[in-house]
Amino acid sequence: MEVILLERVAKLGQMGETVNVRPGFARNFLLARGKALRATEANKKHFEAQRAQLEARNLDRKKDAEVVAEKLNGQSFILIRQSGETGVLYGSVSTRDLAEVVSKEGFTVDRGQFTLNQPIKTLGLHTVPVVLHPEVEVEITVNVARSPEEAERQARGESVTEREAFNLDDLGLEVGQALADAGEGADDRG
């Protein structure tokens, strides 16, 4: 199905281009979200008549997105979640969670603007791309931790999932003596 793009669409084309796409993609995504028009003669004439207005509106949206991008780029946000000892979350962090935490900080973002290939399922610092406009993309850092104190430690670069190694000598035990005692106990039973 041929459509006329009303805005830049990643991996497809620029505003004003006529592209050939699958009918389902056109109906369910491009046409439904107002990103394209069917490429009929009437729509082509209508688009050319409205082109200047569409370009001006696109430029305004881009400028607004750039203002937000300046403030948002490089920001770090903390998400507190429960996890196991190995750092694997009991749930996951989705785009909805990201939109909620970023909105609480005063930014206007939609969950569809976050680009996650898969949900975040581990503790740690994660870099997440945010597409504010088809031509404006920034990255934020999401610090997923079990507590605010742990988030501070992660921000300093400390690992919170490693088990602390301990020395038996620090516990006041002689390794050889402990092994010998364990061996004697086995002889008494046998």
Curated annotation (Swiss-Prot):
SUPFAM superfamilies assigned to the protein according to its UniProt record, in alphabetical order: L9 N-domain-like, Ribosomal protein L9 C-domain
UniProt-recorded name of the protein: Large ribosomal subunit protein bL9
Listed GO CC annotations: ribonucleoprotein complex; ribosome
tRNA-binding as a keyword of this entry, yes or no, is: no
Q: Which GO terms describe its biological process?
A: translation
Role, per record: Binds to the 23S rRNA.
The record's listing under InterPro entries reads: Ribosomal_bL9, Ribosomal_bL9/RNase_H1_N, Ribosomal_bL9_bac/chp, Ribosomal_bL9_C, Ribosomal_bL9_C_sf, Ribosomal_bL9_N, Ribosomal_bL9_N_sf
Signal peptide annotation: none
**The UniProt record lists the keyword Flavoprotein:** no
Q: Which Pfam families match?
A: Ribosomal_L9_C (PF03948), Ribosomal_L9_N (PF01281)
Q: What is the lineage of its organism?
A: Bacteria, Pseudomonadati, Pseudomonadota, Alphaproteobacteria, Hyphomicrobiales
Q: Could you tell me which HAMAP family the record lists for this protein?
A: Ribosomal_bL9 (MF_00503)
Ordered alphabetically, the record's keywords are: Ribonucleoprotein, Ribosomal protein, RNA-binding, rRNA-binding
One GO term in the molecular function aspect is:
structural constituent of ribosome
* Family per record: Belongs to the bacterial ribosomal protein bL9 family.
Species of origin reads Methylobacterium radiotolerans (strain ATCC 27329 / DSM 1819 / JCM 2831 / NBRC 15690 / NCIMB 10815 / 0-1)
